[in-house]
Curated annotation (Swiss-Prot):
<protein>
    <recommendedName>
        <fullName>Glutamate-1-semialdehyde 2,1-aminomutase</fullName>
        <ecNumber>5.4.3.8</ecNumber>
    </recommendedName>
</protein>
<dbReference type="GO" id="GO:0042286">
    <property type="term" value="F:glutamate-1-semialdehyde 2,1-aminomutase activity"/>
</dbReference>
<dbReference type="GO" id="GO:0005737">
    <property type="term" value="C:cytoplasm"/>
</dbReference>
<comment type="similarity">
    <text>Belongs to the class-III pyridoxal-phosphate-dependent aminotransferase family. HemL subfamily.</text>
</comment>
<dbReference type="GO" id="GO:0006782">
    <property type="term" value="P:protoporphyrinogen IX biosynthetic process"/>
</dbReference>
<keyword id="KW-0963">Cytoplasm</keyword>
<comment type="pathway">
    <text>Porphyrin-containing compound metabolism; protoporphyrin-IX biosynthesis; 5-aminolevulinate from L-glutamyl-tRNA(Glu): step 2/2.</text>
</comment>
<dbReference type="InterPro" id="IPR015422">
    <property type="entry name" value="PyrdxlP-dep_Trfase_small"/>
</dbReference>
<keyword id="KW-0663">Pyridoxal phosphate</keyword>
<dbReference type="InterPro" id="IPR049704">
    <property type="entry name" value="Aminotrans_3_PPA_site"/>
</dbReference>
<feature type="modified residue" description="N6-(pyridoxal phosphate)lysine">
    <location>
        <position position="265"/>
    </location>
</feature>
<dbReference type="Pfam" id="PF00202">
    <property type="entry name" value="Aminotran_3"/>
</dbReference>
<dbReference type="InterPro" id="IPR015424">
    <property type="entry name" value="PyrdxlP-dep_Trfase"/>
</dbReference>
<dbReference type="InterPro" id="IPR015421">
    <property type="entry name" value="PyrdxlP-dep_Trfase_major"/>
</dbReference>
<comment type="subunit">
    <text>Homodimer.</text>
</comment>
<dbReference type="InterPro" id="IPR004639">
    <property type="entry name" value="4pyrrol_synth_GluAld_NH2Trfase"/>
</dbReference>
<dbReference type="GO" id="GO:0008483">
    <property type="term" value="F:transaminase activity"/>
</dbReference>
Length: 427
């Protein structure tokens, strides 16, 4: 029995399902989830001392790779001064200033402790600002596990086949209107019918929780125009794409300014953190300036600020995101070549340093329906074959993959060698 098997059995005694987030349970791919004990650079090491090239990156935050020495030094330094104050710190202001400098649409920022908290708060703010109740989200897009957003959600909810989680009152769900991602006409038709009731549209500019689906040309620009036409607040959920697709996020890459944005993952450098922000006119409605209440005991935690500030400064160097995107491109080209050589139907998608893998004969991946053409059973076999070859992919056919600046030629070769063997075994 492996160490991971023993630990997983023990974990299930007091932790529901043995994990603290559903996708970690390997329910989609089968087998025993790996328990990790160490991570450095592009690698993670499990409890049985096997090392893997990591394309999960803690689900996105580890853009520098694991255990970057500068980030560790920043955290160690802050440890000497305390873990949490529950009071303002200079680092909170530094973080707000830096986020507003890097992201085109940000004029004011509120720090929180998670991406879910950020999206939940942004939606409450949009409702308070507009005086409207309804929101529009997109099929397969995941914005955290708050009640109003667990309607036709992606991520773990998609993996588990739960379109609307039990425990969400119908009275909550009725205000959440869902339309297909990348279908601008569906949004246009819905707003023509109920636009006066809609407070906001929330969208992942790159849908990263039904694998990785970039926006169709003109789609985000079309959403911006429709929101302007109907007086609807446009929210970009950049918890995943922020500072990864480009330094200024997907909104900078696609040149579209939302009214509000949410961030997480990278801004904490691996620590639990999130933020939301945007137009001063809207953000001034948040307490204590305005009547929309939002608060958090650990918001702006100094350890998270130290790790996040260091991370953002390091990724701000010229050429960083070009290098990250180039590695991702070479990875996907190499995988595609090897799949083609093996006669395996296979499609990839990319947005900067994030990517999607699909065992599908679709000509392109644009919609939720395209995503669902992917052969989940074949991905399951591929996942375990890659694990055997020393490569750790996201344990679900519906999750995006992530690269880091620590991935280089050696990791690329190891990955492609493992993939060549895996594709051959899938014939």
């Amino acid at each position: 029995m492996s160490r991971s098997e023993t630990l997983f059995a023990n974990a299930q005694k007091h932790i529901p399902g043995g994990v603290n987030s559903p996708v970690r349970a390997f329910k989609s791919v089968g087998g025993t989830p790996l328990f990790f004990k160490h991570a450095a650079g592009a690698y993670v090491t499990d409890e049985d001392d096997k090392r893997y090239v990591d394309y999960v990156g803690s689900w996105g935050p580890m853009i520098l790779g694991h255990s970057h020495p500068d980030v560790l030094d920043a955290v160690r330094n802050q440890l000497e001064h305390g873990l949490s104050y529950g009071a303002p710190t200079a680092m909170e202001t530094e973080m707000a200033d830096l986020v507003c400098e890097l992201v085109p649409s940000m004029e004011m920022v509120r720090m929180v402790s998670s991406g879910t908290e950020a999206t939940m708060s942004a939606i409450r703010l949009a409702r308070g600002f507009t005086g409207r109740d309804s929101i529009i989200k997109f099929e397969g897009c995941y914005h955290g596990h708050s009640d109003s957003l667990l309607v036709k959600a992606g991520s773990g909810a998609l993996t588990l086949g739960v379109p609307s989680s039990p425990g969400v009152p119908a009275a909550f769900a009725k205000h959440t209107l869902t339309v297909p991602f990348n279908d601008l006409n569906a949004v246009r038709d819905l707003l023509a019918e109920v636009g006066q009731e809609v407070a906001c549209i929330i969208v992942e500019p790159v849908a990263g929780n039904m694998n990785c689906v970039p926006p169709a040309p003109g789609y985000l620009q079309g959403l911006r125009a429709l929101c302007d036409e109907h007086g609807v607040v446009l929210i970009f959920d950049e918890v995943m794409t922020g500072f990864r697709v480009a330094l200024g996020g997907a909104q900078a890459y696609y040149d579209v300014k939302p009214d509000l944005s949410t961030f997480g993952k990278i801004i904490g450098g691996g620590m639990p953190v999130g933020c939301f922000g945007g137009k001063r006119e809207i953000m001034s409605h948040i307490a204590p300036l305005g009547p929309v209440y939002q608060a958090g005991t650990l918001s702006g935690n100094p350890l998270a600020m130290a790790a996040g500030l260091t991370t953002l400064r390091l990724i701000s160097r010229p050429g960083f995101h070009d290098e990250l995107s180039d590695y991702t491109r070479r990875l996907l080209e190499g995988l595609q070549q090897r799949a083609d050589a093996a006669g395996i139907a296979f499609v990839t998608t990319q947005a900067g340093g994030m990517f999607g893998l699909y065992f599908s004969d679709a000509s392109e991946i644009v919609t939720f329906e395209d995503v669902m053409t992917s052969d989940a059973e074949r991905f399951k076999r591929f996942f375990h074959l890659m694990l055997e070859g020393g490569v750790y992919l996201a344990p679900s056919a519906f999750e995006a993959g992530f690269t880091s600046i620590a991935h280089g030629d050696a990791e690329l070769k190891l990955t492609l060698d493992a993939a060549e063997k895996a594709f051959a075994a899938l014939k």
